[in-house]
Regions:
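Flexible "arm" and connector segments at domain edges
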Residues: 1-87
Length: 87
């Protein structure tokens, strides 16, 4: 269903990004429930879709690649403190 006549481009970008993030959340949940081997391909698919939406946010000038690049080490440092993911 095309929403172009109902939503602005900005609204479409926000809405589709929210939907894609939700689909990634759901895929991660299924890995936790059903096992890594069974569902990890879905995580890759949905993560790629989220990355595509982030790229569009950069193209629209909402965020910059520099902002993203600066944020990554901050998050990784937090993970070192609050989780075992990077230990």
């Amino acid at each position: 269903m095309r929403l172009t006549n109902k939503l602005t481009k900005n609204q479409q970008l926000l809405t589709v990004t929210m939907e894609e993030c939700g689909e990634l959340i759901q895929a991660c949940s299924k890995v936790a429930r059903f096992g890594f081997e069974e569902k990890i391909d879905e995580v890759a698919k949905e993560a790629g879709d989220v990355l595509a939406m982030i790229e569009l946010m950069v193209e629209y000038g909402w965020i910059t690649q520099e902002q993203l690049d600066n944020r990554i080490p901050i998050k990784r440092n937090k993970l070192k403190i609050y989780s075992d993911i990077l230990k």
